[in-house]
Amino acid sequence: MRSSSLPGARSPRRNGSGQSRHRLPPGRLRTGSRAPTAEARPHVARSPPTPGTGARGGGRRGWGGSRAAPQRGSCASANAQKQLRQTAATYMLTARGGSRSAERKGDLQRTFRQVGQTMPMVPPLDFTMNAASVE
């Protein structure tokens, strides 16, 4: 008996038999992922999002998604989207975003260290004596 004939040997996704055929409308039967996007995805917004709102992700710093290619919609290919994501990530790191906050963090740590050196040593308060004297 071949091991691949066992039921759990091969995942149904790899085989392509994992799709529930009764749920697909008859027009899209066995078309796979290359179905025409206009009919297959009616949930995608037809009108582009208003500029400046950052509707497409990445709005952590207040500016909209990837600044390199504004609002490409969902028609970009997978490779193009990967590149967009990469450029957006580099923008996040190199522009005002990440590196500046890292600098600020370093500055804060430096000032705290200096404050710690200049401040005189304060002995910790002993609360047990205060509690005993109140009673």
Swiss-Prot record:
Residues 1-80 are annotated as: Disordered. Residues 54-65 have a biased composition (Gly residues). This is Putative uncharacterized protein MED14OS. It comes from Homo sapiens. The gene is MED14OS.
